[in-house]
Structures are given as structure tokens and as C-alpha cells.
Amino acid sequence: MQLLSSCYLFNGLSESQLLRLSAITKEEQMRKGHFLMHEGQVAEALFVLKEGFIELLTAVNDDFELPIAILRNPGDCSGTSSLVAPYEYSLSARCAEDGTLFVIQQADLKHLMLKDHELGCTIMKNLAQHLLERLKETRQELKIHFKTLFKSSHN
């Protein structure tokens, strides 16, 4: 339960809410090289890292995937596309080493969120804040790339 509380999605949940969340959470072993999800696939689960590394990838073309990030801290999560329409994973996730993760099925989490609106609002608020931070980071990266491109084209 403590690991779930370290996941940004579940910040601010009460102990009783975390207990209900842990009741729908399953611990699974992950093997190096195994894909947890594929970009464009129907998003059916949320994954919370317990131990190991998960590499997040996006397809550039048919034979090349670009690494976007590595989840390495206990409590890091992926699969938040399972909470937002159109419910398709926006990235692929591959286990970079053997480890353990918690899996929460989308249907179970949505049911819990509908039963406990406060829990649902907290999770969605945390998701919105996280996505806003990611948007800001992406905007900063674009500025850097644009400046570099602009400088190189004017030299």
C-alpha cells in the first residue's frame, strides 16, 4: 500500500481509499524484453513499478522505436491512457530488466472511481497536473530544438 501512495496518481488518497485501491491491484513479475503494452493498443491496465526498469518507446517508423523515458523509481507508473478516451496506449513499454510491478485493470479502477467520487476526482486531478507538467516540459524541449534549428539555418 505504501508503494501505491508514492505513485503521483494516488497522492492525497486517504488510507481507506488506498486500501480499496490495493484490493484491486495485482502484483506481477516482469521479464526483461517483455512488452507490457504497445502504442495504439487498447489500454486495459495501469502499471505501477515496484522494482526493475521499464523503457517507454514511441514508433518513429516500422522498424525503429525511439526511447522516450525510463521508469526506474518504485511508484513510477505507465498506462494512464487507460483513464482517458480513446483508451489507447500512446507509447509502448518494454521491461528493460527483470522486476516486479503492480497491475490495476482499467475496468476495476473505473468501477472504484465511480463508487468513490472523491477518489476518482483526486486521481483525475493528479493526472491532469502530471500531464500539464509533461506539456510544459515538451514545450521547453521544442523551444530548444527550434532555437538550434534556427541558429543552424542562419549560419
Feature locations, PLM:
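A short, charged helix-loop
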Residues: L101-F102, H111
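Cyclic nucleotide-binding regulatory module and flanking cytosolic helices
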Residues: M1-E27, R31, S82, S153
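A small-molecule sensor/coupling module
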Residues: Y89-S90, D108-L149
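Cyclic nucleotide-binding regulatory domains
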Residues: H34-E97
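Helical coiled-coil/dimerization "stalks"
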Residues: L149-N155
